Amino acid sequence: MNQFKVISKFNPTGDQPKAIKSIAKGIEKGEKFQTLIGVTGSGKTFTMANIIEKAQKPTLVLAHNKTLAAQLCSEFREFFPNNAVEYFVSYYDYYQPEAYVAQSDTYIEKDASINDEIDKLRHSATSALFERKDVIIVASVSCIYGLGNPEEYKKLTISLREGMEKDRDEIIKKLVEIQYERNDIDFSRGTFRVKGDVLDIFPASSSSKAIRVEFFGDEIDRIKEFDVLTGETITKLKHISIFPASHFATSKDRLEIAIKNIEEELEERVKELVSQDKILEAQRLKQRTNFDIEMMREVGYCTGIENYSRVLDGRAKGTPPQTLLDYFPQDFLLFIDESHVTLPQVKAMQAGDKSRKDSLVEYGFRLPCAYDNRPLTFKEFENKLNQIVFVSATPAKYELEYSTNTAEQVIRPTGLLDPEIIVKPVKGQIDDLYTSIQETIKKGFRILVTTLTKKMAEDLTDYLKEMGVKTRYLHSDIDTIERMKIIHDLRKGEFHVLVGINLLREGLDIPEVALVTILDADKEGFLRSETSLIQTVGRAARNSESKVIMYGDVITKSMEKTIKETNRRRKIQMEYNEKHGIVPKTIIKDIREVIQISDIAEERKEYDNLNEALKSYNNDIDKLIEKYEEEMREAAQNLQFEKAAHLRDVIYKLKRDKETEL
């Protein structure tokens, strides 16, 4: 078995060795809940990597969105080049769930655009768990959604060995059963092709490599892995496992049993609807379900097959769905990154799903078994866990209450101190703010200003602009792409002051920021809680000359705790710097990635000017739609999700305009 081995030119320093030892020891002792409290810039990901190396357990790292998951995945791949580091997020570029709005009698059909590359990565993740133990999967909260039965997935796997007696047609039949399609012309992921005694299989978990099985009569003569593009042999294999092309693949025997149970549930539900004088709903349910059953009998699956997952798995009513967590062995390790944000997300998922399903079941669009195609409840999520490490700069009450061991990581290897916090009275705050802004701009740095209300943010932005300060306002209506462009422009010095209400969201770790000001800091509430204040102060923790000004007439408990905690961290870092002769230096952070995203924002202007685009296509709306669809697929393939999503919206607008004209 391959062992986890961290490859890095750095060694753990500062608080890292102590944190690694403490958490690793807790894992060895069997502690279920532990917390790693790590300040911004202290190297939490490197600490996590070293804990994984010591624990030697299959590991799931849970992040609260796709972007953070991708960043973590890239970092772990650098630390573990010889181990399996996989990425598991929702494969939808666009997803409109099935719904029914009773007030307007509107049925909204499920509409989705699946990203083929992410689907491949999901298959790569699950197959890795069956093939090896040295696996790290970085996932978003989509890992708590139903995925199909892991036992069935494993049972349907086709195992091929050199010298094995196996009839070629029998293998082809099994490939079709696990939802591979024969395609001798367009050989792509999830397909196979046949030419004489040669069978080529393109695994669902691959994008460029396929398997060639050569037969001599009824015996497997040779197995090779080859490059799909060039046809060149990469390596000769003694054995290969072909995993199903769908996580919802089901054996014929189980499918027949499931269909029988679906028919019984349908009969029972139709009787119930008729008894309530819901004749239309009963007829609708019968027609839709019978169509699904017919599809399952003919091709082994149907659109929306996940709504029958409980019946296909043979689970009892109300039991939790099988998820990615069930694909892991029992002794797996879970890291929950930014746990103060991720855990509330996990808690909220199931309630939202149920409210949407209520109307679908009530009005005869779905059988009641659809309720069990859902995310896990928080209690079910807890029950599936083995050992958990919460990772956060500001862990919430849940993490601290449940954790039996807490390790703290305050020291930054760069020597950077937490910023100095100055409290000033509200009277004259705007004049004082203006003076502080001018002083900071003269030094060549940037400023973040947080307000409590939208009106104050707008008024302050207008005032600063009138005073000749280059200022922008970051509000909730600004989408991700434009937001990234604003941050990019701030870093470049296109403007100097960024005003906002909630500046805690990702993407605001800006080394050029040397001043963070918090207006109305003494107004207790969500945006001025201890957690929010510590996170806001952290925005200034990337610059050696940074400081934070809090404007307030009284020092609230949240302010007091924030100041006390920041001063404690500053003292620890200063003592460490003095002992090791470290001079704090501002983090030099490459802005290349932000520029790339900003380029996408520039491209949007072209798509937004549809009248000009139509003129260039002689008002041929179909040709323009075709062009944009091609660009959307290309963008999705290149993992440019923001660009692909915007193109999708443009295409919908064009299609609506076309229908209106007709």
From Swiss-Prot:
CDD domains per UniProt: DEXHc_UvrB, SF2_C_UvrB
Domain Helicase ATP-binding: 25-182
SMART domains linked: DEXDc, HELICc
Record-linked InterPro entries: Helicase/UvrB_N, Helicase_ATP-bd, Helicase_C-like, P-loop_NTPase, UVR_dom, UVR_dom_sf, UvrB, UvrB_inter
Keyword annotations from UniProtKB, A to Z: ATP-binding, Cytoplasm, DNA damage, DNA excision, DNA repair, Excision nuclease, Helicase, Hydrolase, Nucleotide-binding, SOS response
Domain Helicase C-terminal: 429-595
Localisation: Cytoplasm
GO biological process, one term: nucleotide-excision repair
GO MF terms, alphabetically ordered: ATP binding; ATP hydrolysis activity; DNA binding; excinuclease ABC activity; helicase activity
PROSITE patterns registered for this protein in UniProt: HELICASE_ATP_BIND_1, HELICASE_CTER, UVR
Domain of life of the native organism: Bacteria
Pfam families in alphabetical order: Helicase_C, ResIII, UVR, UvrB, UvrB_inter
Residue ranges occupied by any UVR domain in the UniProt entry: 622-657
Gene Ontology CC: one annotated term: excinuclease repair complex
Binding site for ATP: G38, V39, T40, G41, S42, G43, K44, T45
Motif window: Beta-hairpin: 91-114
Entry domain remark: The beta-hairpin motif is involved in DNA binding.
Record note on quaternary structure: Forms a heterotetramer with UvrA during the search for lesions. Interacts with UvrC in an incision complex.
Family from the record: Belongs to the UvrB family.
Function: The UvrABC repair system catalyzes the recognition and processing of DNA lesions. A damage recognition complex composed of 2 UvrA and 2 UvrB subunits scans DNA for abnormalities. Upon binding of the UvrA(2)B(2) complex to a putative damaged site, the DNA wraps around one UvrB monomer. DNA wrap is dependent on ATP binding by UvrB and probably causes local melting of the DNA helix, facilitating insertion of UvrB beta-hairpin between the DNA strands. Then UvrB probes one DNA strand for the presence of a lesion.
Name recorded for this polypeptide: UvrABC system protein B
